[in-house]
């Protein structure tokens, strides 16, 4: 318990230090800092929670405008650990302004998606801006 609290506090401090807002609880699976998911956020969050419970993993996603120069790997690890410590699972992160995405893996040896699925997601995110469909497809593939 102390370890989880320590990681949460450190993650919040790093988030404040580097300007990356970290504000979510452990029941939040979809973080939409860019407000591109709109009315679909609660439905996607419920779906992610259900898939996570069924799989015994944390399946999460974060969309942000920018990583403030930290990069998607660093931000996804920071946010994931702040929410779930070392629980096994995955986090898809996409930075709109940076045109960069990454799938962070905690306690797992492989990513939940095939290379073909990753390419399809990238096309939807970066080229077509189908954010809701992309997050939904990620959840389906990860589950």
What are these language model-derived features?
Residues 2-143:
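A structural boundary signal for the start of the first folded domain, especially the loop/turn
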């Amino acid at each position: 318990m102390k370890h989880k609290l320590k990681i949460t506090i450190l993650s919040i401090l790093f988030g404040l230090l580097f300007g990356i807002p970290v504000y979510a609880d452990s029941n939040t699976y979809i973080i939409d800092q860019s407000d591109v998911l709109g009315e679909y956020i609660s439905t996607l969050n419920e779906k992610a929670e259900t898939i996570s419970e069924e799989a015994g993993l944390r399946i999460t996603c974060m969309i942000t405008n920018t990583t403030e120069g930290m990069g998607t790997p660093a931000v996804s690890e920071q946010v994931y650990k702040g929410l779930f410590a070392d629980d096994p699972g995955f986090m898809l992160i996409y930075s709109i302004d940076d045109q960069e995405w990454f799938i962070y893996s905690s306690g797992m040896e492989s990513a939940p998606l095939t290379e073909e699925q990753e390419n399809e997601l990238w096309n939807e995110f970066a080229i077509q801006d189908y954010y809701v469909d992309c997050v939904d497809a990620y959840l389906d593939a990860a589950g």
